[in-house]
């Protein structure tokens, strides 16, 4: 897929890699059927079968990688969740996008092999510090560091239509800001010294109007300018910095500490059904396991049924993601200066009167091998 750039003239152009211009599908094809009919047929085929189809002919490969196919799938309500992963190989380089695909062959157990495949046409992020949020088929990017300086730029990547557009800038440059979407509005919090501009500590972007709104509420809790993680549960924004766990209720304008959240929350976590999943060490069994936090009762517990997760001895730099309601763990393992990325997919369910969370491993395998070390910058679902 290639991406088309659309620039808002009121904003300066960020120094990001410029994508190539999309090309329309050439016609006619060598097949007896018009391209439009073939694309309509492909729209009803699961994406996991596309790698096999792409090997049939050059025409099939061209149509499967076209933007038109994504659009038709959306019109026919045949969209699927695709895992997007951004990897950075040094602090001076912009991250590179990958997607989790299935290879067109099966292993000895007759199950499909999953691989991370580079997506070079997708516009890159600033080298570090961006606040990135995925909504449907779009990726919104706020601020970050470009050539050593923080930026106030905002842009959106439309993965369905293959477009790239600059949006109105924030009032102040930000890096490593907290963020969260509540009721169609994106709240961007911090990311700079609060004393420099107290009035702009929180900015609100209206997704429908595509405009920024002011926010009058002040943060009465001690929050660092650099946040490590932020998530949304039950329409509240949970923020983790280097020392505190802060809960922000945008509707009430209330900020408060959550000391229980501080204890076990780590960076590589995710939210599924308003529950926070993260990595945790079981001091009794002396192994790393998946922990879950229920904000409604403020209780941590271990996910049952998956005590023996492979490769869980190395969780530093690893990430979790909500992949269509399933828990995906992407393990970033150092191998003699290189990197092995292992992916584990887990189905979750509540059981019993106590509502215990149980998991079942659906599959796990090596999805990418790299000669150099890497950092997982982003890992989330896109609907296309």
Swiss-Prot record:
Signal sequence coordinates: none
Start and stop residues of the Kelch repeats: 138-184, 185-235, 237-274, 275-323
Disulphide bonds in the chain: none
Alphabetized Pfam families for the sequence: F-box, Kelch_FKB95
Residue stretches making up the F-box domain: 27-79
Keyword annotations: Kelch repeat, Repeat
Protein's name in the database: Putative F-box/kelch-repeat protein At3g27910
Organism: Arabidopsis thaliana (Mouse-ear cress)
